[in-house]
Amino acid sequence: MTLLETTVKECLNNVVKQYASQTALIENQSKKTLSWQQLQQEVESVARGFLSMGLTKGDRLGIWSANSKEWIICFLAAAQIGIPVVCINFHLKKRELLDLCRLTGIKALCFSDGFKSNHFIEVINYLSKKASKNKDALPQLFISMGNQQAEKSVSLSQLKETSQKISDKAYQHAIEQVSVKDLLTIQMTSGSTAMPKGVMLSQYNVINNAMLSAQRLGVTHDDVICLAVPLFHCFGLSSCLFFALTTGCQLVLLDNYNAEDVLKAIQHHRCTIMHGVPTIFSRLMKHEQFSHYDLSSLDKGIIAGASFPPALIDDIETILGMKGITISYGQTEASPCCTQTLPNDALEIKRHSIGKPLPFVEMKIINLKTGKPVPVGILGEICTRGFHVMMGYDNAPDKTKEALDEEGWLHTGDIGYIDEQGNYHYAYRIKEIVVRGGENISLCEIEEAIAEYVGVDATKAFGIPSADLGEEVIVAICVQKGYSIGESELREFLQERLARYKIPKELHFFTEFPHTPCGKIDVQALKLQLGYGVSIKDEKNMVAG
């Protein structure tokens, strides 16, 4: 086994050579399909269109849209000619998008009509007016991928019409300038107290990470992935789009996660693979119409992105029938996968570990104070090194130095350990520790204890400042439909399981949690609902994917 030295363009060419007439993409909503050969033709047309509009290698393209074939076409077209893509969260509002454009230096912006109540056209019109006076800081080209046009935008069809202006020689020259080590994408990480950081990933990073993760999962060109996670997120980009690009498998695109839509898509398209954060899987199995759908085609997938109760793996294997489910650990800075269990690993391994490192991935656990490796079974910081580690943070050399040491090790900020079998275990984020009266309290430990109580659907613990003790623990609890939980009874339950100083100061009950587009609990929205705003703790929750 060796690492690939192929660009995105070469990956697409290889897939087309083998599976030209096989379906590459299906849009679940529109039912539109593209074969691999048709996808290649669309990508080439848009790439030529970008060149005709004056974009060149190194210019940055933003994509602001929900999952769609146009999203994929524009991304691959940009990658072919060395234009890095800034993947934009479709929930961003006007001010956030403006800040993001200034932060990343986006020169052109592809956009759709909007997402739910977030209407993009109004924002694009505002942005285009500001852009004329800020040519160095804001996009100068706006490309509509949807049905609506902004005031100063060109449509994707108009862009493709200009592609004939680019000769074959000029197009080939642009392609030949692209290297596997060139910047492919800038992925924005979320932060609770500061501007987000732009993680720079190369074509080499993402292609090889996807290839090795897909191999561990056992993906072939016969597989069909139900793509229910956002493409703007590294999990969706690598484990879905680039799984397809390195194996020739088929993608079924959903523009938004909705449990019933996912159930329908799996049944109709006979999907064999589904990836997601724990919430996606648990919501699916709890849907009132779950038993009405035939999900027998589902075979394997990846669960990542957040901690989960061990029983969830049992349910995924027995209720969903996904015997090949794997657990993956990583973060955006690692392209994103570092470790992954095997599809045929014993349930005990899947319940409690995050598996072994992918091939060519180095891992170690170090003592936080000395920086030296710790023995088997001892907690320390998880560090990783190899082909998958990011190029750095965009325009943030100081932040890059904090994350990457002189020997190339990425310090993940996660605490874990390795067992005697070589499996890694995730414990908690370094910043998911609350110090109450001098005592260190693991928020994960509290969440896991509460999760054992009957009727609890999900939990989120966080720290708040305390004038007396430094910090106190607050817990939000989502109650399962049909259940009622009494606070006094729950406190009695916790007193039998946790030391007195670990008992939360406040327990808050919800019927539903706010979630990010990736399916994770939206911690900042939750804090705002409880009246605490941003806590002194940075809970980025970059556990995986």
Identify the residue ranges that each predicted region occupies.
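Conserved AMP-binding/adenylate-forming core of the ANL superfamily
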Residues: L4, S21-S68, I72-L76, K93-L98, ...
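Conserved pre-ATP/AMP-binding loop-to-beta segment of ANL
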Residues: E5, S21, I143-N147, V154, ...
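Conserved AMP-binding A3 loop
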Residues: T33-Q37, L184-N208
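Structural core segment of the AMP-binding/adenylate-forming
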Residues: I81-Q158, K481
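AMP-binding/adenylate-forming catalytic core of the ANL superfamily
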Residues: L92-D99, F111, M274, G386, ...
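AMP-binding/adenylate-forming catalytic domain of the ANL superfamily
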Residues: Q140, M145, A499-I521, E539-A544
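Gly/Ser/Thr-rich phosphate-binding loop
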Residues: E161, C271-G276, M285-I349, E362
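Conserved AMP-binding/adenylation subdomain of ANL enzymes
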Residues: I207-V224, F232-I273, H287
